[in-house]
Amino acid sequence: ASFARVCKVALAAGWSAALGWVGTPGQIGGALKMNAGSRLGEIGNVVKRVQCISNGARIVLNHDECGFAYRKSNFPENAVLTRTWLQCDDCTVQESTNLMVEANKLLERRHLSQPKQKSAGSIFKNPSGDFAGRLIDEAAGKGLRVGGAEVSKVHANFIVNRGGATAKDVVTLATIVQERVQRMFDVVLEWEVKRVGDFS
């Protein structure tokens, strides 16, 4: 199921935690794997258990075994997530109409503060107490380009496809950005995007 659909159903049920998921693309499996969300709530907050297939065996992990933390989880590396049970124990249940109004406002703000071009979303995790986008901006990263990939001039933590960008272009550009930020701030930006394959 798409994460957007899960978010919509949760909002309709009055789950305030789902406000943190608004506008996040992808499927529910990916959202669980990276514990998608924002300061308003992460998917891991409402997970009761997850069923997955790992090395040919079906296993069910309870909430604590999932090991949810900022942009990560504890699922086996090659696990395929097949089912999840969500339960709103700690989140506030509100009038769904009010939540939908708030969700639409959040979406509108996102559309104004994030690039419209194709991208993989936020490239780096926010370091503790700071924002990756701010650090990249301060390190003069906005507008840097490799091939068809460019650091967005709207939000520096997005690498957008300006036409014909390859995965190698994106990874090369992101590495340049990491090096700039580390030189200027002595902060190593950690990938938020999961890379699969050889980019050499």
Where are these regions (language model features)?
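Anion-binding (especially nucleotide phosphate/pyrophosphate-binding) glycine-rich loop
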Residues: 1-28
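Short polybasic amphipathic segments
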Residues: 48-52
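Phosphate/pyrophosphate- and phosphate-bearing ligand-binding catalytic cores of soluble enzymes
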Residues: 53-175, 179-200
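Short Pro/Gly-enriched beta-strand edge/turn motifs at strand-loop
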Residues: 32-34, 65
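Short beta-strand or tight-loop elements
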Residues: 16, 46, 64-66
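Gly/Ser/Thr-rich helix-start
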Residues: 24-31, 38, 122, 148, ...
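A glycine- and small-aliphatic-rich helix-loop capping segment at beta-alpha/alpha-beta transitions
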Residues: 9-15, 34-44
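Short glycine- and Lys/Arg-enriched binding-loop motifs that mark or flank ligand-binding interfaces
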Residues: 19-26, 33, 117, 144
